[in-house]
Amino acid sequence: VIDTLTGKREMRDYQAVWMENDFIRVMLLPELGGRIHRAYDKVQQRDFVYYNEVVKPALVGLLGPWISGGIEFNWPQHHRPTTFMPVDFTQQQGEHGEYTVWMGEVEPMRGLQVMTGFTLYPDRALIEITGKVFNGNATPRHFLWWANPAVKGGDDHQSVFPPDVTAVFDHGKRDVSAFPIATGTY
């Protein structure tokens, strides 16, 4: 557990895995939990998730450091305990020109193998994200998985939910509130 930050600033390079087609360019950071750190629309010439050029951790995660920006992938609950730690990765070229990067780990809380796949297709302006969970334990394990995208808000910003969503939860399922109008403690 890391429970203090020094405030010391230093220049540092991180290993990046780049994915690119004619429409988008994506930067993945396996050293920082396998997050999408940057996603750039080459046609509109703009980032389509918030790109934070500075890695400045805050003590938000279960084991300490967490950073803002990009898209963070979380399991088994809360901001993933290993969100600021390196993950393993492998790359695959598909038979139809698609390119996939798999990032994953055996997470320490429940001993599950968790993988996130990022696929770019040559003729599409999208990132296909696939989650896989393998339980090699003798008993079932409780598990949550979600992506935490950072976007730049504004007057025209909207969050769209499926019509069957009637409740929202905080990080660890501690507090529940009605949706779309929050009531009670949250």
Q: Language-model segments: which ranges?
A:
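Extended, loop-rich substrate-binding clefts of extracytoplasmic carbohydrate-active enzymes
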Residues: 1-11, 16-20, 68-126
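N-terminal start-of-domain structural block
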Residues: 1-38, 164-186
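Acidic, contiguous internal or C-terminal segments within carbohydrate-active enzymes
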Residues: 6, 26-44, 103-153
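Acidic-aromatic substrate-binding/catalytic surfaces of carbohydrate-active enzymes
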Residues: 16-20, 24-86
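Histidine (H) residue identity feature
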Residues: 37, 78-79, 96, 142, ...
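Polysaccharide-binding surfaces and accessory modules of carbohydrate-active proteins
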Residues: 44-71, 128, 134-186
